[in-house]
Design a protein with these regions (language model features):
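Plant-biased, solvent-exposed loop and capping regions
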Residues: 1-883
Length: 883
């Protein structure tokens, strides 16, 4: 092992230590059988065991390694190291006596060599969890497929291929491994049906098929696996699986059935599992009440029922589950009033999450009642009106969520006293807090990483949190004054949202200084003035900048080109005076550009070769002073709008995952959008990644509408209103198959409305008023739904027949959006609409306002910046089932 370097960051285990370092201390002349991790045969002296798991090794295993001379080796453990994306060496086949091989969690990359099948004596093979920090599976099965594995390893008792990219169905032949007691195929991109032959693996005590793409029904033959103690089928696409067969598995200790499309009530068959310790049923569609019989499962330590549709009260009988450590009931429809003292008997309870229900929680606890020491406590949306006094004794809190209540008054000083050692995440948003008792300073919370104080009644200067902070959101308060220089001491800051306050002064230069860590910067809706400084450094990781609704002026800083990861840039409603920033095309990830309502001027025709905006989907240049023609090549640069690809539906957002003790927590910063759609100004709380919109309204563009617009088939909304455009309406606009809103009003367009536009079957809003159009108004399909106001101010237009209500008054469903999620209907049911009727020509208002949203799907790594908390170690936390 002399070719390896020793790195403290080469293993994620807290128990790792460099075993090979002791070999040098003992000296090469010493007996190697006495070295750490080495086992020798007592009779022959041959090395038969080598355990270098978690030994902080970094490097690769080359073909000349002395490792392959240990031909008598029976057990080899190299798991938990960093082999730096090297391949599993094919010469490992020389170790033909191996019965145990562990190469897990060690950054091996590429296809598993076929030669490994020559190790026919193996009883345990672990190649699992070779993933990087972005959750990418590094190993592939390749020609070493499951069928060949089943043929060559007939003596296998333990097999772990978790996070190996297999990408196939599971062959029936796998059931030939009849000696298996442990099988982990989690996160292998498996698909199709689970073979019924799995029921023949009757010795299995551990079976993990989670995080795959299995479909259909779960085979009833799994009822034969009566030795199972751990079963995970989570995160698959089963069709309403029936679970009556679970009643046979009375040895189960851990059951993971989250996110598998379960419907109906919590299965009655679970009540036979009297040994069960962990019950995971989250992210399904379970209804009804929490059954009373669940309190008879007295061995339970974890109950996860979050994200379902459960109703009724939390049964008081759950207080009998005296071994309970984690209880997650958030995001259901639970109701009623509960006394918090009901949890006093659960002395081991460290995690309680009951937010986002319809509960009223009474937190007055008598002096002689002793509550458990919580580490994770989520009481959001629990109708609290005062800060819970019982928290005074909760000095082990890591995560505290009291958001969306009605808590008044000041944030108590004792919170700083009890939280200074452990509190990492504090969420107090959407309350009525007016300040901090005795002006105590947030810097007391020295471990704090995430802080949300949005939507309260805080006044005065911006509170400065401790340097440990990664996310800080204090939007929608009444803070005043300038940003203090001490804010720039937050060198780890990744998310900063100070929007919707009354802050003033110059844009702080230092915010650009730590843009290598900063991902989201939102200073919108304040009173900042002056120039945006040339402060954005090389290697910036900024994804989103929102400086809209301020009083900023001058030119755009060219240092923005350093923000190569930028996705959203919103500078609307300022006083910026500059030419069109063609150079922003150098930002390869830019998706949304909002320059609305500034003092930009001149032509948008590039003086040189036009660079491509490769990913731009929303561009708003409205209400500026742009002049000249609309250059054809400008629209040709909008590459991502030219193709209507059916990519996976998501929302534009940035996610950060905290790896906390016991579990991880995702925080999603989801971008929002303001639209004037169908003449109504609305706020959309989420931006689907399939939306494309162009707004060039209220400028002084002239000349013809370029034919090249007709190639932008992905565009949903096009607004060219209130300019000086002339000539005909090009019939190629009929090629915009996804168009839902078209506004050409307040121009000097002439000629007829092309009949070809009737092919736009998604068109829900059409306005050509106040032009010089003539001839018949097209009839049929969506054109039968537009009223006269769409055409007024064109004296030469006429209708052959009066418009009447059509059966297609609602546009067909857009193919790129989920059902009931058209461009005009992407709002969740429970959010507020902001609607103001606007006049003609006022345009499509596309403005990005960023809102903070929190989710807790566990765990999903995303931000590489924070995935490497120590050195350059590349890893993803294991998301698997606890053994």
């Amino acid at each position: 092992m002399q070719s390896f370097s020793i790195s403290n960051n080469a293993s994620i285990s807290s128990y790792a230590y460099p075993k090979t370092a002791s070999w040098k201390i003992r000296g090469e002349s010493s007996d190697c059988c006495l070295w750490d991790g080495v086992e020798c045969d007592e009779d022959t002296g041959y090395v038969i065991g080598l355990d270098l798991g978690g030994s902080s090794l970094h490097g690769s295993i080359n073909s000349t390694s002395s490792l392959f001379q240990l031909v008598h080796l029976r057990r080899l453990n190299l798991g938990g190291n960093d082999f730096n994306y090297s391949q599993v060496p094919s010469r490992i086949a020389l170790l033909s006596s191996l019965t145990y091989l562990n190469l897990s969690n060690s950054m091996f990359y590429g296809e598993i060599p076929l030669e490994i099948t020559e190790l026919s004596h193996l009883t345990s093979l672990d190649l699992g969890r070779n993933v990087d920090s972005s959750a990418r599976n590094l190993l592939e099965l390749g020609s070493f497929d499951l069928r060949r594995l089943a043929q060559n390893f007939t003596g296998l008792e333990q097999l772990d291929l978790s996070s190996v990219n297999i990408s196939s169905t599971v062959p029936d032949a796998l059931a030939n491994l009849s000696s298996l007691t442990f099988l982990n195929l989690e996160d292998c991109n498996l698909q199709g049906l689970i073979p019924s032959s799995f029921g023949d693996l009757t010795k299995l005590g551990y079976l993990n098929l989670g995080h795959n793409n299995f479909s259909g029904q779960v085979p009833l033959s799994l009822a034969n696996l009566t030795q199972l103690e751990v079963l995970s089928l989570s995160q698959n696409s089963f069709i309403s699986p029936g679970l009556s067969w679970l009643g046979n598995l009375n040895k189960i200790r851990a059951l993971h059935l989250s996110d598998i499309n379960l419907v109906g009530e919590i299965p009655l068959s679970l009540r036979n599992m009297t040994r069960i310790s962990q019950l995971h049923l989250s992210n399904n569609r379970l209804t009804g009440k929490i059954p009373l019989w669940i309190s008879n499962l007295t061995q339970l330590t974890l109950v996860h029922l979050r994200h379902n549709e459960l109703q009724g009260p939390i049964p008081e009988s759950m207080s009998k589950l005296v071994n309970l450590e984690e209880l997650k009931l958030e995001y259901n429809h639970l109701s009623g009033t509960i006394e918090f003292s009901m949890f006093a008997s659960l002395k081991h309870l460290t995690m309680l999450q009951i937010r986002r229900n319809n509960l009223t929680v009474l937190t007055n606890i008598s002096d002689n009642t002793t509550l458990p020491k919580f580490k994770y406590l989520a009481l959001g949306d629990c109708n609290l009106s005062e800060f819970p006094d019982f928290l005074r004794s909760q000095d082990e809190l890591i995560y505290l969520h009291l958001g969306r209540n009605r808590i008044q008054g000041q944030i108590p000083k004792w919170l700083g006293d009890i939280g200074h050692k452990t509190l990492s995440i504090l969420i107090l948003r959407n309350n009525l807090f007016s300040g901090f008792e005795q002006s105590w300073e947030l810097s007391l919370l020295t471990k704090l990483q995430w802080l949300e104080l949005d939507s309260n009644k805080l006044e005065g200067q911006l509170p400065i949190p401790p340097p440990s902070l990664i996310g800080y959101s204090i939007s929608n308060n009444s803070l005043t004054g300038e940003i203090l220089p001490s804010l720039c001491n937050l060198r780890s800051l990744g998310f900063l949202d100070l929007s919707y306050n009354k802050l003033s002064g110059m844009f702080p230069n230092c915010l650009g200084d730590f843009s290598d860590s900063l991902l989201v910067l939102n200073l919108s809706n304040n009173f900042f003035h002056g120039r945006i400084p040339q402060a954005f450094r090389d290697e910036s990781n900024l994804r989103m900048i929102d400086l809209s609704h301020n009083q900023l002026e001058g030119q755009l800083p060219r240092s923005l080109t350093n923000c190569r990861m930028m996705e959203i840039l919103d500078l609307s409603y300022n006083r910026i005076s500059d030419k069109f920033p063609f150079w922003l095309a150098n930002l390869p990830e830019l998706q949304v550009l909002i320059l609305r309502s500034n003092q930009f001027f001149g032509s948008i025709k590039s003086p040189g070769a036009m660079l491509e905006f490769r990913k731009l989907q929303i561009i708003d240049l409205s209400y500026n002073n742009f002049t000249g023609i609309l250059p054809s090549e400008f629209f040709q640069t909008l590459r991502s709008m030219r193709f209507s690809d059916l990519k996976e539906f998501t929302y534009m957002q940035t996610i950060h995952t905290f790896q906390l003790p016991v579990y991880s927590r995702d925080f999603t910063y989801r971008y929002e959008i303001n639209l004037a759609n169908k003449g109504v100004y609305m706020k959309y709380w989420q931006i689907p990644n399939v939306i494309a919109a162009i707004d060039l309204s209220s400028n002084a563009f002239q000349g013809d509408i370029p034919q090249s617009i007709g190639t932008l088939e992905k565009v949903n909304a096009l607004n060219l209103s209130n300019n000086h455009l002339s000539g005909d309406i090009p019939s190629v606009l009929g090629n915009l198959a996804n168009l839902e809103s078209l506004d050409l009003s307040q121009n000097m367009l002439s000629g007829e409305i092309p009949q070809y536009l009737t092919q736009l079957t998604f068109l829900a809003y059409f306005n050509v008023s106040h032009n010089q159009l003539e001839g018949p108004i097209p009839q049929g399909k969506q054109f039968n739904t537009f009223d006269n106001s769409s055409y007024e101010g064109n004296s030469g237009l006429y209708m052959k027949h009066l418009p009447k209500k059509s059966e297609c008054s609602e546009p067909p469903q857009h193919p790129n959006l989920p059902k009931h999620q058209g461009f005009n209907n992407i709002l969740p049911k429970d959010i507020e609409w902001i609607a103001v009727v606007i006049g003609y020509g006022s345009g499509l208002v596309v403005g990005v306002v960023v809102g903070l949203r929190v989710s807790a799907r566990i765990p999903e790594w995303f931000v590489k910046t924070f995935g490497r908390t120590q050195g350059n170690r590349r890893r993803r936390e294991v998301r698997g089932v606890r053994r």
